[in-house]
Structures are given as C-alpha cells and as structure tokens.
C-alpha cells in the first residue's frame, strides 16, 4: 500500500497562499515607497532601526546579524554600503579588537527620521488603516505565536529583543 503525501487541506492552502502573497506584496510596496522617497532599501532601513533602538545607536556587527537572522557577510556588506553613504560608521570594540560595532552617524539619524516618516505612512496605508483594532490584535497574537515556533530560543521575548545590549556605554561611544 502506498502512502499519500501529506497535503494541506483546502482551507489551509487558502490561508497559506493569502498570507504569503499579502506579506510579499507588503514587502514590495514598502520597499518601493522607501526607495522612491528616500532612496533607501528596506533592508538598510531595518538595520538603521535596529541601531536606533540601542541607547547609543551602536551594536556589534554580530548582534545585528543575530537580530536580523542574516549571515554576517551580508551584514558586513550592508554596513559597508551604509558607511559609504555616511549614515553609519564602523568602530572597533575596545575590549575585543576582533569585534566591530556599527554606529549611527548624525547623517544616519537624519536619514532614519525621513525614512521612518515614509515607513509609518506606508504601514498605516497598507496595514493599520485597513485593519480594525481587533484585527490588529489578532495579527499581533498570530505573529507572536509563529515567531515563538520559528525562533524558540527567544520565545516570548521578540518585542524586547531590540533593547538587549552586548556592550558597555563606553564601547559604543568610543
């Protein structure tokens, strides 16, 4: 007797297809908005946001890679591009010369302010203006449930992870 391959049911397939398409289109639209208005890729914007959440606007490169679930080589490339634009600078870690920090510059803070304003308008237009408060709560609950399954090491802590620090204030401001 041959076993049938596992298949999604019709309702599961509709749910999956709708979720994947919605988030792909959302990603594309936000990317287009940021590129069109401030000439900044969404990925770079997300890195600037990560840096801005640190009290000193600086994180170890390894921390950026971990928080974004991105390979260190991709983070290095992105930070190099951001540094070429004058938005980020790379600094050596005082107590570990093999480690590097990425730190927002004044110009980077200005870019983040402008890009952040565009990002907020996009999020409102594509997400929050079309969802009721109840749906927004459901989306949050669903997202947290999925994140806890996909990233069990940080289960329950996804909202607070951005504030975690790996360094001392002296290292970041050096």
Labelled PLM ranges:
Residues 28-71, 158:
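N-terminal helix-turn-helix DNA-binding core of bacterial DNA-binding proteins
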